[in-house]
Amino acid sequence: MASSEVARHLLFQSHMATKTTCMSSQGSDDEQRKRENIRSLTMSDHVGFESLPDQLVNRSIQQGFCFNILCVGETGIGKSTLIDTLFNTNFEDYESSHFCPNVKLKAQTYELQESNVQLKLTIVNTVGFGDQINKEESYQPIVDYIDAQFEAYLQEELKIKRSLFTYHDSRIHVCLYFISPTGHSLKTLDLLTMKNLDSKVNIIPVIAKADTVSKTELQKFKIKLMSELVSNGVQIYQFPTDDDTIAKVNAAMNGQLPFAVVGSMDEVKVGNKMVKARQYPWGVVQVENENHCDFVKLREVLICTNMEDLREQTHTRHYELYRRCKLEEMGFTDVGPENKPVSLQETYEAKRHEFHGERQRKEEEMKQMFVQRVKEKEAILKEAERELQAKFEHLKRLHQEERMKLEEKRKLLEEEIIAFSKKKATSEIFHSQSFLATGSNLRKQPQLLIFMEKYFQVQGQYVSQSE
């Protein structure tokens, strides 16, 4: 198929739903045109706007397309192999460890070209999914990643100077959910994860490594899986049936869900030709043989038939739901309390008035809180001041008492010094009188005189030491 024909085919699919809806409601449209005073006219000659589809095709081919796939499944279940087989390309994805402490999402973008149609393909792999002992929150990193891509697109959309034409749209268009071929039922982790993802992304469940289960068990397993999904309220992607050209095929494919797939890039010789297959001792499982697996059906509905619908559903359903919830959280609404239309300016003014009132209320609360805290601080400071004053008075009283004690001791010491001085003077007078009285006798007795002089010298030294 030529590139222009591929683009026309994609655009034709994207617009057929609108066309069919318009044809089915033609009567109501006529009444609406009458109410709006719109007239239908027939032109007398060729004008040229019939080339609008061709213009759209040419511009789309020039711009290129993007498609983002999220692969969710346990490590080693065959996610990378299936993607390689789907796009007939070796994306060189490295093997992941089974010992990751947390679930991480790894995104890789590739540029592919078929004829002259360019496709920017992003593959997001869930590294470490299902490898933890506690798997209760394993789905949360996936939900956060999808919401982050929606938020990035919303922020770009809300910019004053936005450039959506050159913006790399990283929103997830489809989630291929890989189910282990146990043959029994869905794991609790699978149900919990798909339940939290069904409102955010288009989910297509696939049974991985379907060649490990017999055909009879596989058919029973499919019925069991769909029954569990329905009973638990999990909404998986349904291929659209409103386009007459593909309605029959998509209706049949909806009855084949979940697809049982086998992936392989190895080629095995079967008969006179080489085919992609998996070689076993008991035989060969051909990837593109519909009697062996549903790989061809998956590739047909995912890439050839419904790729544009997946892109459109992502934008019109899942992104719009996220956008609406975000704007409602911000206070924006389409109708007022009386169910009257509300313009963006009115909503802005209402929110501005609300924020102004909230700001004034917060300022008043902060002022009151500040005054209260100042009063509390002043009370604490006054109490501390009283305690310091009491301590000061106590220390002052102790100082005065100590000073009075020292003063009394000083007076007693002075009295003792005066008394000692009097005793010393009396002793000196006594010694002088004794010396004069015995002076004449000492002259007569030289030895006695020498003894008396030594005696008085010793007594004088003793008195000096006492002073």
From Swiss-Prot:
PTM remark: Proteolytically cleaved in vitro in a calmodulin-dependent manner.
Residues annotated as domain Septin-type G: 63-329
Primary subcellular site in the record, as a coarse category: cytoplasm
Domain of life, source organism: Eukaryota
Region (G4 motif): 208-211
Any single GO CC term annotated in Swiss-Prot or TrEMBL for this entry: cytoskeleton
Pfam families, sorted: Septin
Assembly with partners or alone: Septins polymerize into heterooligomeric protein complexes that form filaments, and can associate with cellular membranes, actin filaments and microtubules. GTPase activity is required for filament formation. Interacts with ADGB.
Protein role: Filament-forming cytoskeletal GTPase. May play a role in cytokinesis (Potential).
Protein family according to the UniProt entry: Belongs to the TRAFAC class TrmE-Era-EngA-EngB-Septin-like GTPase superfamily. Septin GTPase family.
Protein name: Septin-10
